[in-house]
């Protein structure tokens, strides 16, 4: 989907895209009402029902679902497909625990939005246009619309001590 969107955006034309989901969680497909069943998804394309969604960009790279950095961002790619098939969302948690055992890299950033400036170290950040991320509903907020021109942002600060570390883990659980 991402490569298709990138190609269409480079054409600088509004062209409808048909999408048949093939992932484990299929958050984006669920958000726009596409069934997980491939023949049913294909039929929805044939029927021609259109959904408009916002497209974000970073340095000529486009996204419609999520752009993220930091801890756990490689989990969906690193998780074994057979494990995903048998355990579903739990497979991601198993992989996340493996990654948790490695050191968390921190990213020093200055973030500006509206009249607010935040400068700190972060272990995770994402810009999302989705009602759920990795099957977890509400992570990007509860008032999410895919075509409102607004992307939701989530930042998780780097824990500076053991108490903050435990609070971070509890918030992620």
Model-found features: residue ranges?
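Short glycine-rich, flexible loops that bind phosphorylated cofactors or substrates
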Residues: 1-2, 134
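Catalytic core of DAGKc-family lipid kinases
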Residues: 2-127
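Catalytic phosphate-donor-binding core of small-molecule kinases
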Residues: 47-48, 96-107, 147-173
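Short acidic/glycine-rich loop or secondary-structure boundary segments that cap or lie
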Residues: 73-75, 119-121, 132-136, 161-165
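Short, solvent-exposed amphipathic alpha-helical segments in soluble enzyme
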Residues: 9-10, 80-81, 141-144, 169-172
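Gly/Ser/Thr-rich active-site loops/lids in small-molecule metabolic enzymes
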Residues: 83-90, 132-137, 141-162
């Amino acid at each position: 989907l991402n490569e298709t969107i990138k190609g269409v955006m480079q054409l600088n034309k509004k062209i409808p895209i048909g999408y048949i989901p093939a992932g484990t969680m299929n958050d984006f497909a669920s958000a726009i009402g596409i069934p997980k069943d491939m023949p049913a998804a294909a039929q929805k394309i044939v029927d021609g029902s259109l959904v408009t969604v916002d497209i974000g960009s970073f340095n000529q790279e486009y996204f419609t679902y999520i752009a993220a950095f930091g801890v756990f961002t490689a989990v969906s790619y690193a998780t074994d497909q057979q494990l995903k098939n048998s355990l579903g969302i739990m497979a991601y948690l198993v992989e996340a625990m493996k990654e948790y055992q490695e050191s968390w890299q921190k990213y020093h950033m200055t973030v500006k939005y509206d009249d607010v400036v935040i400068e700190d170290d972060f272990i995770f950040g994402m810009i999302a246009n989705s009602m759920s991320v990795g099957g977890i509903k509400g992570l990007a907020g509860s008032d999410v619309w895919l075509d409102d021109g607004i992307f939701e942002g989530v930042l998780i600060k780097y824990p500076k001590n053991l108490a903050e570390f435990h609070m971070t883990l509890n918030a992620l659980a």
